Amino acid sequence: MLRTTMVLKMQGYWAVGSGKGGGNEVDNRIDRDSDGLPYVPGKMLKGLVKDACLRLKNAGNKNYCFVDEIFGAVDSNENMNRTTSKAGKIYFSDARLSPQLRLELSKSENRSAKDNLTRNIYSTAIDDETGTADDRSLRGYEVAVPMDLYARMECDCDKTTFDCIKKAAGKLVRAVGSHKSRGLGEVVIEFKDEA
């Protein structure tokens, strides 16, 4: 089993959430872990990295023929279900703040330290003819500030395949979460291999 630490260097505001609203304040809140801190689920990371590898495979790169074997696949016939799917050989943990920062934030006497990790941003639609905001078009989003998040990646594969997966993630995963077309979620992915 090969292991590495995936470092997500969030370059700007980002939002990973389920679309749940926050009452009158915002329409979409970000997801938080059990400590109330922003995070990126491992399932999302797996999907982003699989997509990066699939793009290289579909472009004709023979080094990426492993995608179904490593990430898992469903039966190609029409009656797809969990019993006919093939399990993958790769695992991603949730991407979270560093243990040191998590410890500091848990010691904080006031909630403002955690609150400083998020912001609310707003947008509205503008009427082209009048140049004013359309009625009922104001939307609010909770976003997380730029930060580094850490996830574990483990794979039951050879080193060449593992290196190809890391290369695809580092080169092709450019954004994480929602509202990417509006500039949110820009990320740089790096890896810290174990000695």
Locations of regions flagged by a protein language model:
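RNA-binding basic/glycine-rich loop and surface signature characteristic of RAMP-family CRISPR effectors
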Residues: 1-118, 122, 134-195
